[in-house]
């Protein structure tokens, strides 16, 4: 089966302000069948300007990744991080 992923890049402006989001996000992931593959908060960026945060989350399919993003639970979590970060999130599928 083709896996789905969230690829997240960007910057965190107030690290302590992100703690509630990170705690709830980490607890929420298993409830949607997802797992955190990579969390690098100080990435060594060699090209481009994606920011120092790089996160990859794996889902059982791209459809599940999209459904998780669109879920009420995740939409509520987003509000916990908005004022503390500038992040981009893209849903992708594996080959």
Language-model features and meaning:
Residues 1-53, 60-66, 70, 93-95:
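Short S/T/G/P-rich N-terminal loop/turn motif that feeds into the first structured element of a domain
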Residues 62-90:
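C-terminal structural segments of small proteins and small subunits
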């Amino acid at each position: 089966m083709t896996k789905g992923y969230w690829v997240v890049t960007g910057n965190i402006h107030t690290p302590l302000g992100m703690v509630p989001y990170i705690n709830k996000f980490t607890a929420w992931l298993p409830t949607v069948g997802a797992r955190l593959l990579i969390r690098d908060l100080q990435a060594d960026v060699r090209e481009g300007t994606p920011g120092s945060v790089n996160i990859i989350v794996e889902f059982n399919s791209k459809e599940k990744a999209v459904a998780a993003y669109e879920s009420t639970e995740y939409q509520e979590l987003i509000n916990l991080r908005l004022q503390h970060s500038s992040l981009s999130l893209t849903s992708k599928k594996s080959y």
